[in-house]
Amino acid sequence: MQTSHYAAEKDMQDAVPRLTFTLRDEERLMMKIGVFVPIGNNGWLISTHAPQYMPTFELNKAIVQKAEHYHFDFALSMIKLRGFGGKTEFWDHNLESFTLMAGLAAVTSRIQIYATAATLTLPPAIVARMAATIDSISGGRFGVNLVTGWQKPEYEQMGIWPGDDYFSRRYDYLTEYVQVLRDLWGSGKSDFKGDFFTMNDCRVSPQPSVPMKVICAGQSDAGMAFSAQYADFNFCFGKGVNTPTAFAPTAARMKQAAEQTGRDVGSYVLFMVIADETDDAARAKWEHYKAGADEEALSWLTEQSQKDTRSGTDTNVRQMADPTSAVNINMGTLVGSYASVARMLDEVASVPGAEGVLLTFDDFLSGIETFGERIQPLMQCRAHLPALTQEVA
């Protein structure tokens, strides 16, 4: 089975056209790079053969400081309140997003910092105040990722799951949520009245020093409509292995949704990088990780993905649970030599609407270093970066 997957993946890679950029293209293709920090144990590989580690502040500090050194543009942490179990206890051990990113804001100076709000757990007025605080810590480098929540057991364990009708109304809920945030970040006062929230002369001060960026990760039609109206950019999954432009239809849908609102909302695409000196060496790593897939944890993911029967078939969780490459929750995966990965990332940048990528690595510390030293210098879409001037531990 692995051999046939390999052949199919290679065929897909060979089918991707090699791009030759003009100067005009290079000016357009200045792509942002971010790191999706491992706030949960073992990062994004659900495998007994992958590096096994616990999330700590010190680990994430080292990762984000190294990313800042190599001119990454932003760092994002997710929020996860219950894991998948299995032999690897995948994501059973997690830090909290806002407090982690507040700490990271204090030990960095340039990189943009994003925390994720699980909006069912936090009233918008509290998120508004926490965000304003981290804005102060970071000197205006903070933004908020808003998620509606899809894994029912995360919220049932606390007695706050609103019922399965929420699946079909979650973006109505989020729309009210962000309107309250906008009031409080803008004027410091909200009297919003809606189906989900009632504000009575609610106050938050001080306000953020700069306009607060809001991001989202909707791939359903409802999610994209929300992002088109309220988000500064929208995350989406890359697709396949070594098929760097396969997400293009998703980016096109986001562009079309944004055109309806008259706003510019680009796509930032999630990829895992597995790189080595040669294509064969990188491929051997990938096959090794797949061979150790934690089937018990993966079955939990599949079970949870089937609970939402009301949001349609185009949601993020549907892609995460696809058996094709569930070992890394089916994010786009770039496997190859440093030169091959650089070329594929330039191809990502060529897709209309793709303004950035959010990267994970099989091994974060060594992965970011090899990316900064060996991959990024080969990328035409990062040719605008200044030279490195200092060492980082």
UniProtKB/Swiss-Prot annotation:
Residues noted as binding FMN in the record, renumbered to the chain: I79, K80, N145, E154, R170, Y171, S220
CDD domains, alphabetized: Alkanesulfonate_monoxygenase
Keyword Magnesium recorded: no
A GO BP annotation: alkanesulfonate catabolic process
GO MF annotation, one: alkanesulfonate monooxygenase activity
Conditions for induction: Up-regulated by the nitrogen regulatory protein C (NtrC also called GlnG) and repressed by RutR.
Similarity comment: Belongs to the NtaA/SnaA/DszA monooxygenase family. RutA subfamily.
Function: The FMN-N(5)-oxide reacts spontaneously with NADH to produce FMN. Requires the flavin reductase RutF to regenerate FMN in vivo.
Protein name according to UniProt: Pyrimidine monooxygenase RutA
Organism for this UniProt entry: Escherichia coli O139:H28 (strain E24377A / ETEC)
Lineage summary: Bacteria, Pseudomonadati, Pseudomonadota, Gammaproteobacteria, Enterobacterales
UniProt gene name: rutA
